[in-house]
Amino acid sequence: MEEIDQAGVYAPYLALWRQGDCLLPERALLAWAQSQRLLPLLLWRGKKAGWALPDALTRAAQNVRYREQAQQMLAENQLRALGVLAQKLDIPLVLVKGACVARVYPETWLRPYNDIDLLIAEEHLPYFLPAVLDLGYTWLGALTGQRGWHLPPLAPKTTGLKLEVHTALARERGRSLFTFGQWTTGIHPFIPFPGLWVPDPVDHALYMIHHAIVHHELVLGFLPFIDLAYWTQSWGEAEWQALADQARTFDLYRVASLSFALTAWLSDIVWPRTVQQLFPVPPDDILLAARRIVIGAGTQKLPHLQRDMPERNLRGLLKYLGLILLGDPVTRQALPRSEKIRFYLRRPFQLLSNHGPTLWRLVRGERRTRAAWQVQRRLQAWLRDEHL
């Protein structure tokens, strides 16, 4: 398999990431590292290993580092204020995703993130949303119509990161996954920010895996798997066994196996025997297809039929189309009437803007788009143990 990789189109990018070798023009390497959100981490790795990175890459990485440090200072102020609000309302708010994961990196600025994600119990939304709006947050109108099943983002009053409020962190085939109710027994206080909570590490790892491979179908690139390497670096046999058990319970065992195979490949590591036994490496064709998507970091927005259709029949297709066009009615109830109207007016046009060109190429039979669609279909079918 490695011979195929080294002869492949993505060998120069792997060489940059693993050894700091520059086998392509600086502009191409810089564009790739930016798209993968790896510049701060690449700079840090280069300094540790003594790599001679090109000046353009170094300058760009330093700029991203300073910007990320400033942005995370603003984020920490927001987190403190949200923690105080949670204590005042006596509502548990669970911090997830980037702001949570950054804490396991050697330095938090190595892990860029652009928003703050909170998980909340659905019954607490009527109390939390008015209170957070009173803090000065406003619905981010430009993005209000882009969400199929969860709340639009909220923007802070002045400067800072967007706030994403979730009642579930995923939805697949009509099921809400990774909800507050499913996690409630494992959450624990987030010591740096009183009033906020964080998930059980195993629960959050399974969510991270699902988010990268199932929800985003690998198009987020390298970063989710670098996250996973840092997140699990201190785990023992008990945590690995618990993750394997949970992955089987949620029908995510193949997804987890693929995630750890990709993590080992990207980080150039060998997992302990326990991990290798619990999560066997997928077949070569599946692994190669996944690697190509990860390196490319998703150049096309393909429809998520495999993820979002509740049933593989006409009724399932109609439910899928209704969800895409109208949004999730349960989640929408939390929105003010004006925002509901805005969502339904914007939704068709923004769907057309986001997905129209790719869907048109797919319908016309454009070779590259068709090939990407077929690769994604095969990959998702294998992950779900389905026959095409």
Region roles according to the model:
Residues 1-114, 120-388:
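Conserved NTP-donor binding/palm subdomain of two-metal-ion nucleotidyltransferases/polymerases, i.e.
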